[in-house]
């Protein structure tokens, strides 16, 4: 009986330690939601105004322009596209340049 109780307590302790140690990291969407919620609270928005603000904020239409997050591939594509535009490349030359530029990052 004592062994069963001891084993049960041991498993319980291990379980609680594991649950407590697993710090939950927020996803980018959850971070954006928290940020937008704090901004809406600071502006004392209520009702439809808050709902509209939250919707726009989560879509990044009212947040800071640099806050919109791009994937590394999208960033590289934007850089290569800007370089191709600066060099006034068109057609097949542009396609070759873009292909080579995007492969450099990989």
Curated annotation (Swiss-Prot):
Q: Where is the composition biased (Polar residues)?
A: 70-89
- Its domain of life reads Bacteria
Keyword terms: Signal
Signal peptide residues are: 1-20
Region (Disordered), start-end ranges: 58-92
Pfam families found in the cross-reference section: PsiF_repeat (PF07769)
- This chain's protein is named Phosphate starvation-inducible protein PsiF
Q: Which organism is it from?
A: Escherichia coli (strain K12)
From the broadest rank down, the organism's phylogenetic lineage runs: Bacteria, Pseudomonadati, Pseudomonadota, Gammaproteobacteria, Enterobacterales
Annotated gene: psiF
């Amino acid at each position: 009986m004592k062994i069963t109780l001891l084993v049960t307590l041991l498993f319980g302790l291990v379980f609680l330690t594991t649950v407590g140690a697993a710090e939950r990291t927020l996803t980018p969407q959850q971070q954006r939601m928290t940020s937008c919620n704090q901004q809406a609270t600071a502006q004392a928005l209520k009702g439809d105004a808050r709902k509209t603000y939250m919707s726009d904020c989560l879509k990044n239409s009212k947040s800071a322009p640099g806050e919109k997050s791009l994937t590394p591939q999208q960033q590289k594509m934007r850089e290569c596209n800007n370089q191709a535009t600066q060099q006034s490349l068109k057609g097949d030359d542009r396609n070759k340049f873009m292909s080579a530029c995007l492969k450099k990052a990989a």
